[in-house]
Amino acid sequence: MSRDTKRNIGRRSVLKATSALGAFLGLGGVTSATPGRSRSRKKDEIVVGVSDSVSASKATIDSKLPSKATIVHTNETLGYVAVEFPSRASTQARENFKRNVLEADDVEYAEDNATYEAIATPNDPQYGQQYAPQQVNCEAAWDVTYGDPGVTISVVDQGIQYDHEDLEGNMDGSVSNYGDDFVDNDGDPYPVSASENHGTHVGGIAAGGTNNATGHAGISNCSLLSARALGDGGGGSLTDIADAIQWSADQGADVINMSLGGGGFSQTLSNACEYAYNQGSLLVAAAGNGYGNSVSYPAAYDTVMAVSSLDEGETLSAFSNLGPEIELAAPGGNVLSSIPWDNYDTFSGTSMASPVVAGVAGFTLSAHPNLSNAELRSHLQNTAVDVGLSSEEQGHGRVDAGQAVTTDPGDGGGGGDPGDGTCGDETNTETAEGNISSSNPSDAYSYTLDTADPCSATVSLSGPSSADFDLYLTLDGRTPTTSDYDRRSYNWGSDEEISVDLSGNEELGILVNQYSGSGSYTLTIEELGK
């Protein structure tokens, strides 16, 4: 069971979740896009997920399109269609389309195409100016291996300057242009300007040339792929990012790094991460750079390792997000790496911490090539070093390359789906009743976990058939709003349901909101223990 396997936008999301993903995995990797589609940010698009094949569902979606809205992109593997609205279309028109299209039996969800933003001692001459490889104990690992070029790390980010003096030796030459471009769709992920530097910096941290007498030392000498999903302005649409993740997995990437976030929960992006995880990729992502905020997506998905940032003194960076999803910490403050054009600079952010973990994962797999992605994930956790921070700040601890490479994984444990396991018999059920109308359009609730070892929770709403009420949920106790939430269910009518897996660190915030009509409702929370 996975904490984020399906977002419960409607009851059929719960009923069809497993079969839908099975359909995704069995389809060919065919995508199509309309020429002239917006680059990078795609704020005028709505993404519609389907349970059947895209080709079979396209006519249904076409029939729901309002005037001047068009299908501009499809992805058969992940099972979604992108619909573009005119820029002057009202918010109400977009919301009405979402609700209308959700009436179709073969439609699973509809969501905005949100924007995510860019988050032995070697002989490299700038190694003395670095601290990140030393902090994560790379020198002990380098006595065993510098990394196997047969292990591939895909960087879903801005483009990488693949002919950079300190990167070209580690770029994966088995793929045309060492990657692909999902922003311009021209097949070449090369940066368009010197200011498009985030991807080159991230790639250099994970797998810049090490012990090559040039530039700085990357964490590993594994192979790099560039999956350009963020434009030169630093932003990218969820569909471009989802396509890049799927493509990376289809290329056989062992590790996928995502130093990006900020767009909120997306079912499309969740499906892409789950697809890649099931293909055998280890996914690593930046926790986010808004200290005090919860871990951003995609790092917060169960299929992804969320990484927080440490400064040189192994204290939590002032910008690093934190929360129960954090699995590992790594250096992210003032990290030296490559930038265009054959230059070097120091950047700060969880965007820098994430590729440190990705690089360590790469050469851990070089030393222990038989590990599955789940076993590799567990091994990185088990060999991490406690630096005295809370679990919400450091997760299992600071990643340690030396320990990960030199420690025998044994039988590896792990395996299977993330968060697998079944809930037990312990149950706690709470109910509340209320009435909402134009004079009282919403009610807010909070729920504190009650079972000894929480496993899952289902929040359900039952209201009048003549009204339309919606249900919003947060997992950190903050009061949800219609624009700030972690889960949402919004069918026609007033019967809604949201199910979530629990780690034990959550506190539920609940909002019952009037979309139209009025009347009484019953809210039920059922919590299951392990």
Curated annotation (Swiss-Prot):
Transmembrane intervals: none
Biological processes annotated in GO: proteolysis
Enzyme class label: hydrolase
GO molecular function annotation: serine-type endopeptidase activity
Keywords in alphabetical order: Hydrolase, Protease, Secreted, Serine protease, Signal, Zymogen
PROSITE patterns in the record: SUBTILASE, SUBTILASE_HIS, SUBTILASE_SER, TAT
Localization of this protein: Secreted
Cross-referenced InterPro entries: Peptidase_S8/S53_dom, Peptidase_S8/S53_dom_sf, Peptidase_S8_His-AS, Peptidase_S8_Ser-AS, Peptidase_S8_subtilisin-like, Peptidase_S8_subtilisin-rel, TAT_signal, Thermitase-like_dom
Gene: hly
Post-translational modification (record): Predicted to be exported by the Tat system. The position of the signal peptide cleavage has not been experimentally proven.
Pfam families membership: Peptidase_S8
Residue spans of biased composition, Polar residues class: 429-447
Family note: Belongs to the peptidase S8 family.
GO cellular-component term (any): extracellular region
Protein's UniProt name: Halolysin
Temperature curve summary: Thermostable. Highly active at 75-80 degrees Celsius.
Organism name: Natrialba asiatica (strain ATCC 700177 / DSM 12278 / JCM 9576 / FERM P-10747 / NBRC 102637 / 172P1)
pH dependence per the entry: Optimum pH is 10.7.
Top-rank taxon, per record: Archaea
Pro-peptide positions on chain: 28-119
